[in-house]
Amino acid sequence: MQEFISMATEFAQKHTLLAVSWFAIFVMVIYTFYKGATSKFKVITHNEVIRLINSDEAIVVDLRSLEEFQRGHIINSINVLPSEIKNQNIGKLESHKENALILVDTNGTSASASAVFLTKQGFNSVFVLKEGLSAWVAANLPLVKKHK
C-alpha cells in the first residue's frame, strides 16, 4: 500500500495538470451521485412520463414561454413560467398538490430549479422530463398546438 502511495505521489508531481483534472472529475461524479440521491424530485424519461400520465393522473407543467407552448405542448399541459414558481405565484398548481407534477422545459436544463422551488412549497411528487420537450419530440410523441 505504501508503494502505491509513493507511486501516486510521484505521478501527481510529474503530471500535476492530469492529476488535478482526474481529481476534479472524481469530485464532480461524487457530487452528481450525492445530488441525485438527496434530491426531492426525480428526473424521468418520456416513457415514465407516459406511464405517470396514464396511471397516476399526473399533471404536466410546461415551463416554456407562452409562444413556445402555443406552438406545441404535451396534451393537457399547464403553462407556468419558472418566474411564477420562483415568486410563489402558483395558483394554477395549488389544486394539484396531491398529484404527481411533471415539469417540462425545452431541453431539460432549467426545470430542475423549478422542481426545487416546488418541493420547498409542499409539492411531494415532482418529476422532471429528462432532456425536456426535445426528447419527447425526438421520440415522435404527439404534441397539441394551441392557436391564439
UniProtKB/Swiss-Prot annotation:
It comes from the Bacteria. Residues 54-148 form the Rhodanese domain. It holds the Pfam family Rhodanese. CDD domains: RHOD. This is Uncharacterized protein HI_0744. It comes from Haemophilus influenzae (strain ATCC 51907 / DSM 11121 / KW20 / Rd).
